[in-house]
Amino acid sequence: MSESLRIIFAGTPDFAARHLDALLSSGHNVVSVFTQPDRPAGRGKKLMPSPVKVLAEEKGLPVFQPVSLRPQENQQLVADLQADVMVVVAYGLILPKAVLEMPRLGCINVHGSLLPRWRGAAPIQRSLWAGDAETGVTIMQMDVGLDTGDMLYKLSCPITAEDTSGTLYDKLAELGPQGLITTLKQLADGTAKPEVQDETLVTYAEKLSKEEARIDWSLSAAQLERCIRAFNPWPMSWLEIEGQPVKVWKASVIDTATNAAPGTILEANKQGIQVATGDGILNLLSLQPAGKKAMSAQDLLNSRREWFVPGNRLV
């Protein structure tokens, strides 16, 4: 194989852990792992380690969990490791310029989009919501900007009409490690060919909010159906009925024109709950009232038919 590189790995969630697992099987030397500090989780708010920390400790790797990499003593931790390259995957901390320049080959990042489209925090969700035909991963050389570095390698995959953010996440978690290992080989061999991003093609994937996931019936049925898939499994699209939030897990588009005001319930039957939108009809198929499990529209109608009387409006 190519030269074995000394690698610092920096990442936090499961998506990152899958990349670390691939690195550990690749023949490279992972000398240390950086991950976010343990966070309170679950009903008991017990401090929980990140998936990356769990895997690293299983493999006997040194783990560092700084709150920031700005303090000089934390930067010295990186410098002392004398790494060839630092691999960053969904780490969650900003890397100062000094840290970016410490490894011999710099720092590289696995980003969940085909850059320069969808720079930023939520590329998977934004690509789905926008109706993109494909997405993928980009391995890039990091610089001080937000996902602005030169591109080293790309892998793409189609976005299907059934994809949710959850299914796309899994697809990219398979592609990312493949692209990462290939890129490391090219860096080790000196065959990598950095490509500057075209600034005229840049779009930004802003962080998601729960309020943004509230269904806006003035949008088209097609937009709302994509929104429901984009926000599944988090933060989940939702509507409010009698002061209660109701999550929407699945819906379909009915290409029939209607003059009814957006949000008007047109039909409620075993085929679903049909609601007028700004353009077309959205058929709600799977919903989850507060404190309940997700259920079919038919099952919800059996217990809460009064919520979905045709002619009433959802807001």
Curated annotation (Swiss-Prot):
<dbReference type="InterPro" id="IPR044135">
    <property type="entry name" value="Met-tRNA-FMT_C"/>
</dbReference>
<comment type="similarity">
    <text>Belongs to the Fmt family.</text>
</comment>
<keyword id="KW-0648">Protein biosynthesis</keyword>
<dbReference type="InterPro" id="IPR005793">
    <property type="entry name" value="Formyl_trans_C"/>
</dbReference>
<comment type="function">
    <text>Attaches a formyl group to the free amino group of methionyl-tRNA(fMet). The formyl group appears to play a dual role in the initiator identity of N-formylmethionyl-tRNA by promoting its recognition by IF2 and preventing the misappropriation of this tRNA by the elongation apparatus.</text>
</comment>
<dbReference type="InterPro" id="IPR001555">
    <property type="entry name" value="GART_AS"/>
</dbReference>
<dbReference type="InterPro" id="IPR011034">
    <property type="entry name" value="Formyl_transferase-like_C_sf"/>
</dbReference>
<dbReference type="InterPro" id="IPR036477">
    <property type="entry name" value="Formyl_transf_N_sf"/>
</dbReference>
<dbReference type="InterPro" id="IPR005794">
    <property type="entry name" value="Fmt"/>
</dbReference>
<feature type="binding site">
    <location>
        <begin position="113"/>
        <end position="116"/>
    </location>
    <ligand>
        <name>(6S)-5,6,7,8-tetrahydrofolate</name>
    </ligand>
</feature>
<protein>
    <recommendedName>
        <fullName>Methionyl-tRNA formyltransferase</fullName>
        <ecNumber>2.1.2.9</ecNumber>
    </recommendedName>
</protein>
<dbReference type="InterPro" id="IPR037022">
    <property type="entry name" value="Formyl_trans_C_sf"/>
</dbReference>
<dbReference type="Pfam" id="PF00551">
    <property type="entry name" value="Formyl_trans_N"/>
</dbReference>
<dbReference type="Pfam" id="PF02911">
    <property type="entry name" value="Formyl_trans_C"/>
</dbReference>
<dbReference type="GO" id="GO:0004479">
    <property type="term" value="F:methionyl-tRNA formyltransferase activity"/>
</dbReference>
<dbReference type="InterPro" id="IPR002376">
    <property type="entry name" value="Formyl_transf_N"/>
</dbReference>
<dbReference type="InterPro" id="IPR041711">
    <property type="entry name" value="Met-tRNA-FMT_N"/>
</dbReference>
<keyword id="KW-0808">Transferase</keyword>
<dbReference type="GO" id="GO:0005829">
    <property type="term" value="C:cytosol"/>
</dbReference>
